[in-house]
Amino acid sequence: MTLEEKIAMANQVRSRDRFGSVSPEEQAALPGTETELWIKTANGCKIHVFEERPDTLPPKAALLLNFHGGGFIKGRTDRDRRYCCTLMERLNCLVWDVDYCLAPEKAFPAAVHESYGIAEYAFDHAAELGVDPEKIILAGHSAGGNLVAAACIQNAETHKLRPCCVLMEYFPVDNTVNPIDRLSPELKQDPFWVKRSATEKLYTDFYVGDADPAQPLCSPIKADEAALSTFPDCLILSAGEDNLRDDTEAFALRLIKAGVCVTAQRIPEAMHGFTTNRTPGWERALDAHCKFFREHL
């Protein structure tokens, strides 16, 4: 498949998925003020960010950097904005929703560089942003969770990021594995799961490109214990009805064995993407997010 064919296929998926799940009435009622930004970072990236700001931002406020899901090929959605506005209101903090670059146009490691770059920028410019550098949170969902993990692994060498805590949920940690190999023998007979796994494989191939997927920045489960031991306190949520469940939980165990303070929770009834999609279990997840964040602010 040529790059042009990959891009055409990705654009078809994006056109179906991007908007429409949050009603215009609900969007109009979302709290705070949204500002679209382009941030130039020290590592040479120019990153698209949507800032969600409360009506009154307290001095030395917290900053939450949110990294959305979408299989590395889909961008920010109205569901992501709703999630960010909800966190902004509950925590009375500044939120940057990072609309990082997408595959296949920009394959690995471009999104990793952007994710690390925007986090580094936030710490370097905390004073002018009016936020407390000791109250910066990294939060990632699905593909975004992979990028948060990659930023933390990269930080094991640079030591420039000091997040007070991180959230990673229902995220891919091993891009060397064919998604269909994660299915049980029973699920391999189910057309729904077979089709879903084939789609995931396509997304992974678009993201990895010609790179070695065994690199820790691509497959965080491959990181050594020394790198993992540098992670801040983590909240890791898995979805009981997600074929990434076991991988997500395996990564939580690796962090625990490396000495990291990890709060891990499985939401049994949940499917992939449940937090931002607001499918069963999302209220429990959102409450867990807010409780964990408040404990670290």
Language-model features and meaning:
Residues 1-11:
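Generic N-terminal low-complexity/basic-hydrophobic segments
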